[in-house]
Amino acid sequence: MAAHGMSTYALDLRGHGNSPGQRGYVDAWSQWTDDASAFVKQIEAIVGTEVVPLGHSFGGATVLSTVLAGKLPKSKRFIVSSPALKVKVAVPGWKITLGNAMSKLMPRFALDAPAHGSLLSRIPEVAEVYDHDPLVHGRMSSRLYTEWQQATRDIVARAGQIKIPFLILAGSDDNLIDPSGSRDLHAQAPLTSELRVFEGRLHEPFNDLGSEEVFQVIADWLRMK
C-alpha cells in the first residue's frame, strides 16, 4: 500500500505471531475484539487521520465482530480479506460435539491444524517461506474453535446491522476458507458491502500471483468512498 501513498500498521492476534499467550488459544472471542479496538484507537491517536481497519482470515472475522460490538466508534469504513466465516471442508458432526465438550472441560486442549503454504499462495517462494516460518504454528484450542463458530453465526445473522461501508475480498479457489461465506456476508449486507472475488486466487490474495490488482482495488475503493 506504500506504493499508493498509504501507510499500514499490523497487529498479531493474541496466541499468534509475535503476540503473547498460548498458541491458538483465547478465553473468549471478545479478547480479540478488545485487542483490535485498542490497537485501532492507538493508531488513530498516533496518526491523527482516518484509520481504515483491515482484517484477513481470523482477523477479518475479528474486525467484523468488533464493528458489530460497537468497539470501533471512529471507523467510517473497513475491509475484510478472506474472512474466516465458513471452512472449505465440512467438519464431521462428532468432531463438533467433541469440540463443544472439550471447550467446557479442557478449553486449552489444542490440536494441530496445519495448512501447507501451497494452499495459501501459487507463488512457490511464498509457500516455502510460510512452511518454514517459526511463527506459524497451526494450533487451535477447543475454546478458540467454539468461540469462533459462535462468532461466525453472530456475524452472518447480524451483518445487516452494519451501517458503514465495507469491502470484502476473496479468492475464488480458496481451499481453506470457503468464498461462499464472503458471498453470504455480502448478501446479508448488500447496501453497505462491496464484494470482490478474484478468479483463481487462493487464501492469501495479498501474497499470490497478481497481487498488484488486489492492492489497486483497495486503493481505488479507499479513494472513491
In which residue ranges do the predicted regions lie?
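Short alpha-helix in the alpha/beta-hydrolase fold that links the catalytic acid
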Residues: 164, 178-187
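Catalytic active-site module of serine/aspartate enzymes centered on a nucleophile-bearing elbow/loop
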Residues: 192-225
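Short beta-strand/loop motif that positions the catalytic acidic residue
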Residues: 162, 168-170, 174
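Alpha/beta-hydrolase active-site loop signature
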Residues: 13-17, 85, 202
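Conserved alpha/beta-hydrolase
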Residues: 1-21
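Active-site nucleophile elbow and catalytic-triad environment of alpha/beta-hydrolase enzymes
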Residues: 140-158
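Alpha/beta-hydrolase-fold enzymes
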Residues: 54-141
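Catalytic nucleophile-loop/oxyanion-hole region of alpha/beta-hydrolase
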Residues: 17-47
